[in-house]
Regions:
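Mg2+/Mn2+-dependent nuclease catalytic core
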Residues: 166-178, 482-499
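Phosphate-binding site recognition
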Residues: 1-434, 449-450
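Domain-level recognition of nuclease-like catalytic cores that cleave nucleotide substrates
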Residues: 501, 505-529
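Active-site metal-binding core of divalent-cation-utilizing nuclease and nuclease-like domains
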Residues: 134-138, 445-472
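Metal-dependent nuclease catalytic cores in nucleic-acid-processing enzymes
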Residues: 183-190, 343-351, 440-447, 492-512
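Structural motif
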Residues: 143, 474-476, 510
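Conserved catalytic cores of phosphodiester-cleaving nucleases, focusing on short active-site segments
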Residues: 442, 465-482, 496
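C-terminal accessory domains/tails appended to large, multi-domain proteins
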Residues: 453-454, 472, 481-483, 497, ...
Length: 529
């Protein structure tokens, strides 16, 4: 099987025999039932391939779709004038790049259709007049496809980069936003000349005028009809890649069922609507099947620096954001004047929907899968703690220690890790800040550890332990105290009854109390009962 890794052109995929997960039934529904759309999906999730597929569909290239679902649905195969802008390939941290790109594309189209544009008009105004001309010239309304519309904003988001304009200086974030607003708001006036419009991107910026006023696009990002339009569903994985999964299982010397479970835990877990359709990360799945190895393919392709910048100056830690139910208004629209990173984290693919409550119409958000847990949390831990030691390396050491039933290695590994955190990073003046720092540090460590071993979250009437790990032979119950004693931690395990559910268990139950010092920043006492 040939995997289209790095290939986003639909014609190339079809002509050269690469595997294609058939999304054309949804594509037909999209084109048949509406006109102007916006779709938000994380990077490398198939948006560009969707745009490319639509381009060839509206070009009437029927032969490319032979044998696909749309082949039996479409009967006309009309050709339409297509205007396609892809913002993917440009670096918008360079001043005036966005303006030159839009102006250049409009001028190219004017030459293509023999239209003399007025240089005194803005690119948006020239585009409106061009659409009207082409509609009249061809007798066909136009198709506009804009891929990664928000990249000019994401490139400069939350930076201090500036652009000089006449005798003034503006933040590039503001300048690029105003440029996009001018372009998008202008061509919205061309409604009568448009057959179909799709904008794709990572983030829905509420302050870009395409999402306000008349003729605004229908946002299908959370529409259950289209929740599987990008990515790979469980059914698609099983039907299209059944034999490939079996071959991968054979190479890794696991059963086919274990292989499917490994793929699910590492790459599944995305949900884009209240229907809770399971969606696998397509980029990682294709790479894993191609190389027959479980690796963090998607996360390695790009560090989410804009997210790190946002998180670095917000009072909200990741543990404040995960595991909570939200109204859609809290995580769908990103507003640049509000210092809440939640919408950006969700839409970038680092959080996803994990449950839906129909009574409150609210959504539970959490990390989607092990690839994201390990990569994103390690990145945050490195920036938050400032340690030279990798939190992932620590998690592996803790995992290996549990496998060997060696708690002394646990103690030594934790001690060394905490000792590597610079004093300037852990210095907190207020007691509440010290406590918050302490708990967030352990949240990051144990969420990363959970990608290697299952951490039990058993809620008791009196609360729950800081960490419970179950193996085939042992149960480990940890309780941590900041500026307390190990005896106090052990006493809490007894008083709260954390071990009670395991009284009839044949496995050995090991209770560990650990105290940390906010002054030294490391372990003071370690006792086992």
């Amino acid at each position: 099987m040939k995997y289209p890794i790095g290939i986003q052109d639909f014609k190339t995929i079809r002509k050269d025999g690469f595997v294609y997960v058939d999304k054309t039934a949804l594509l037909y529904k999209l084109a048949d039932e509406g006109k102007t759309y916006f779709l938000s999906r994380p990077r490398r999730f198939g948006k560009s391939l969707l745009v490319s597929t639509l381009k060839y569909y509206f070009s009437g290239e029927k032969s490319l779709f032979t044998g696909l679902a749309i082949d039996s649905l479409e009967t006309k195969w009309d050709q339409y004038p297509i205007f396609h802008i892809d913002f993917n390939g440009s670096d918008f941290t360079v001043p005036h790049t966005l303006q030159r790109l839009i102006k250049g594309r409009v001028e190219d189209w004017e030459r293509e259709y023999g239209f003399q544009g007025n240089p005194d008009y803005s690119p948006g105004e020239r585009f409106v007049r061009l659409l009207a001309h082409v509609h009249k010239q061809t007798g066909k309304r136009c198709v506009v496809l804009i891929d990664e519309y928000d990249k000019p904003l994401l490139d400069v988001l939350d930076t201090e980069r500036k652009v000089r304009l006449d005798d003034d200086e503006l933040l590039m974030e503001d300048y690029n936003r105003e440029t996009l607003k001018g372009f998008y708001s202008a061509f919205k006036a061309a409604d009568q000349d448009l057959r179909f419009v799709l904008l794709t991107g990572v983030t829905k910026f509420s302050q870009v005028s395409v999402f306000s006023g008349f003729n605004q696009p229908e946002d299908i990002s959370m529409n259950s009809k289209y929740d599987a339009i990008c990515g790979i569903t469980k059914e698609e994985l099983e039907t299209v890649f059944h034999d490939e999964i079996d071959a991968m299982a054979e190479k890794l010397k696991v059963t086919a069922e274990e292989m499917r479970d490994m793929l699910k835990r590492h790459y599944d877990g995305y949900h884009f609507s209240n229907e809770m359709t399971d969606i696998f990360n397509p980029f990682s799945v294709l790479n894993a099947l191609n190389s027959r190895s479980i690796q963090d393919y998607w996360f390695r392709t790009g560090t989410p620096t804009y997210l790190v910048r946002l998180l670095s100056h917000t009072n909200e830690n990741l543990n404040d954001l995960t595991g909570n139910y939200y109204d859609t208004s809290e995580f769908v629209d990103y507003r640049a004047d509000v210092e809440r990173p939640l919408p950006m984290i969700y839409q970038s693919g680092y959080l996803t929907i994990k449950d839906y409550d129909p009574y409150s119409n609210s959504y539970l958000l959490d990390l989607p899968n092990n690839e994201v847990k390990k990569g994103f949390l390690t990145l945050i831990a490195s920036n938050y703690l400032g340690t030279k030691e990798s939190a992932t390396t620590l998690a592996i050491q803790l995992y290996r220690a549990i496998q060997l039933n060696d708690l002394d290695v646990w103690r030594k590994s934790l001690t060394a890790f905490f000792a590597s955190i610079p004093y300037t990073m852990r210095r907190k003046d207020m007691e509440t800040e010290k406590e918050r720092y302490f708990h967030y540090t352990f949240y990051l460590i144990f969420r990363i550890l959970s990608t290697y071993i299952v951490l039990t979250e058993k809620q008791q009437s009196e609360g729950r332990a800081d960490c419970i790990i179950e193996t085939k032979t042992n149960v480990y119950i940890f309780e941590f105290k900041l500026d307390g004693t190990a005896d106090e931690a052990l006493q809490q395990i007894e008083d709260k009854g954390y071990a009670r559910p395991y009284e009839a268990d044949s496995r050995q139950v090991r209770k560990i109390g650990v105290s940390f010092s906010s002054k030294t920043g490391t372990i003071e006492e370690w006792k086992e009962a």
